[in-house]
Amino acid sequence: MKQSYFYLKMREHKLKVPYTGKERRVRVLLPKNYEKDTDRTYPVVYFHDGQNVFYSKESYVGHSWKIIPTIKRNPDISRMIVVAIDNDGLGRMDEYAAWKFQESNIPGQQFGGKGVEYAEFVMEVVKPFIDENYRTKSDRKHTAMVGSSLGGNITQFIGLEYQDQIGCLGVFSSANWLHQEAFDRYMERKKLLPDQRVFIYVGTEEADDTDKTLMAGNIKQAYIDSSLRYYHDLIAGGVQLENLLLKVQAGAIHHEVPWSENLPACLRFFAENW
């Protein structure tokens, strides 16, 4: 059935990052009829790599997550507020990893290690700002976070470190193999909450040019192994099976095209409890 056209309003904010002193763009996509339904509150989904979320012309790879058409073409998905936090460009690899990379083929170069500070920015600056300025359902159950590649890494970390505040995670093509041992040790020490919902996605043909500078081994297998290990460790830690969804997609590459194609399934999985 043909859906009537509707416009989704977007607002832009500049929030100061405490550890850099610089402002970071944070955009907020409002659900349909947000300004009319003034008594209604909404779940919130936070996205990393905000430049890649809305418009393909802004995306580094020329293709976005297509969140706006996803919402318009899938009216069955619960209405939500979408928050897109821009990455720091050249500082992205440092911010999206809580630990230094153990894998690197670049002599004299070390990446990662600022993920804890970035997580504090997201949870102590961005989330409170959103909850204070928008009609959110600010509780854990209705707070979700999505990221891909290194954005998946930081989603995993924040999802564990702040699991008392985040109820849903969308982890796409995590590059956790870059600091696998450190993440595994960290995860072993955490007491997991059984009702956190986690959507895990990985393709069988993952690997891009950046990956090849960081690892000499079988990168495609590393992506698969890392996602499977995460899934296994969540189960071992007590997360209930009905709260986990793992998808391994044959032939899928490390790119926004398959991520955007699988986003509706991720959002539906979140919304089952909304």
Model-derived regions, located:
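Non-catalytic cap/lid and distal C-terminal segments of serine-dependent acyl enzymes
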Residues: M1-W274
